[in-house]
Structures are given as C-alpha cells and as structure tokens.
Regions:
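Conserved ankyrin/ankyrin-like repeat signature
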Residues: 18, 50-51, 84-85, 109, ...
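N-terminal segments that cap or nucleate solenoid repeat domains
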Residues: 2-35, 39, 105-125, 130
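Ankyrin repeat (ANK) tandem arrays and their immediately adjacent linkers/low-complexity segments
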Residues: 67-84, 153-207
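Ankyrin repeat domain, specifically the short helix-to-loop turn at the C-terminus of the second helix
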Residues: 21-28, 53-61, 87-94, 112-120, ...
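Ankyrin repeat A-helix N-terminal signature
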Residues: 9-15, 42-48, 76-82, 100-106, ...
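Ankyrin-repeat boundary/"N-cap" motif
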Residues: 2-7, 31-39, 65-72, 95-100, ...
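Alpha-helical protein-protein interaction modules
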Residues: 28, 98-99, 103-109, 113-119, ...
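Extended, hydrophobic interaction surfaces within ordered domains
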Residues: 46, 53-89
Length: 207
C-alpha cells in the first residue's frame, strides 16, 4: 500500500517519475490532503510547472480548496508571488472572480468581468474592493483600469486604509503585508506600489 506521505514527498521534491508511478497504482491520492491541501496546491506554490501538468493530466481538481483558507491552487501561487504560475493556471481554466483577478493582476479578465458582470466595481470581498487588492499586490495596470471604471480609492480596507495608504504601506514596509512573496518579487512589488501611489495622486489628488 502506498503511503500518502510518500506521494506528497515525491510531489514536493519534483520527482516526476515517482509521482507518475504512484498515481498509476493509486490515483485516489490526487484528492488526498497533506496539512489540508492537495498535491496540486504544493506544485503550484513551488512553481513546478511540469508537476502541475502531470497532476492535471492525471485528473487533479484545478479548483480544489484547501481546508484552512479555502484557497485554490492559483491562490496559493499568488500568495507566493508566482506570477507565471498564476497565469499558467488561469489559462488552463482556474476559476477567478473579479476580486481575485484584480489581486492576481489578470488585466484581461478584470476588463471582461467589469464589462460583463453586474457586480459593482466597488463591491467588497472580505472587506476589500478589487481596487484595494490590485494596489496591495502591485498591479498598476489593473489599478488604472478600475479607476477608469469607477473604482473608489477612498473606500477603506479592513484596517481603515484608503487605496493610497495601502500602496504607501507596501512601499514603506517593503511588502510586509504580503509576507510569503519571494524576495525578488517583493522588490518588484515595492516598485509597482510606488507607481500605484503616483497614479492615485495624479488621478485623484484627494486620495
């Protein structure tokens, strides 16, 4: 009998052949959980594209949610700042709503959702607007789009901050609000949030 621990160890060590061998014997492991998450979650957060392809090809659930945060693999990838993996999973059909698309920097999807959905651009999810999430995760192009579609930079987040204050906090603390992001992505995040602060001041001086 194959132990799930062996399976997850193989996934996390990027042992493609071993994972393929294990799944051939016990495909039910695709839905197994380790610390509340599936193998696809771990492959996504590790930016292991080959492993993700293998798992999806074997039938892994692209939109499975972890037990702790109710996040899908694309959400895990975003938390780690794995932008390429976010796009990779999105292109393969990962479910993404307006707030998530703003946080993930999926400009084309944000544009489509704003154009075709009836959900207000300033709607809240967990106390956050799409505009605030775009600022938090450093996506200037998404911020500009949402501002042009009526995004309100003066709405306050769960910590009482405006969108400008969110961007400035990310710059001041070097991305402390997104602690899991890799160092190289964090440097980019700080630069992007600085650009977002400039955009907000230019478009909405009272922000």
């Amino acid at each position: 009998m194959i132990d799930a621990i062996d399976f997850f160890a193989a996934v996390r060590s990027s042992s493609i052949d071993r994972v393929r061998e294990i799944l051939a014997k016990d495909p039910a492991l695709l839905v197994a959980r380790h610390d509340g998450a599936t193998a696809l979650h771990y492959a996504a957060i590790a930016n292991d594209r080959a492993m993700v392809v293998l798992l999806l090809g074997a039938g892994a659930e692209l939109n499975a949610r972890d037990d702790t945060y109710q996040m899908t693999p694309i959400g895990w990838a975003n938390e780690e700042g794995q932008d390429g993996m976010v796009r990779f999973l999105y292109d393969r059909g990962a479910e993404v709503d307006l707030h998530q698309a703003a946080a993930y920097g999926l400009l084309d999807h944000v544009r489509d959702l704003v154009r075709h959905t009836r959900r207000p651009v300033n709607s809240l999810m967990g106390g956050w607007t799409p505009l605030q999430l775009a600022a938090l995760w450093g996506h200037p192009d998404v911020v500009e789009l949402l501002l042009s579609r009526g995004g309100d930079p003066l709405v306050r987040d769960p910590f009482g901050r405006t969108t400008l204050e969110i961007a400035r906090a990310q710059v001041r603390t070097e991305g402390a609000s997104t602690p899991l992001v890799r160092q190289e992505r964090r440097q980019q995040l700080v630069a992007s949030c600085s650009a977002i602060a400039d955009i907000l001041l230019r478009r909405s001086p009272q922000a």
